[in-house]
Amino acid sequence: MRVKISHVSTFKVAFFDVDSMEVMWHGNYVKYLEMARCELLDKLGYNYIAMKKDGYAFPIVKLDVKYVRPAFFNDVIKVTTTLSECETFLKFHYLIENEKGEKLSEANTAQAVIEMKNLQTCFE
């Protein structure tokens, strides 16, 4: 089912997320994507805790990140997370911007739905 539900999260780039040039290390962008995705799922009332109670897991099966410009130590970044599809996959789009509204990064993730009792995907 195609949907379009968005949430905006704001974070300050922490010192432990940057390199010696005070630029956020590229792998740490994924951590901010995950924190933003968790906030959106909390907002929807169906977070990972609820999924687990229902017997499901949602592992990331695809991640695509485009880096446009760097984030720096102590920058405030805005992550707009949009859930675009939910059925046999959860598909999210992310836009990371700085306080000036400049695009820093854009990303997409896909999560498969797995039944924990048999570790089978819920594809039809």
Where do the model's predicted regions map?
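HotDog/MaoC-like acyl-thioester-processing domains
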Residues: 3, 7-9, 72-76, 83-124
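Hydrophobic beta-strand-centered segment that forms part of the acyl-chain substrate-binding groove
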Residues: 40-78, 82-91, 104, 112
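Hot-dog-fold acyl-thioester-processing enzymes
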Residues: 2-60, 114-124
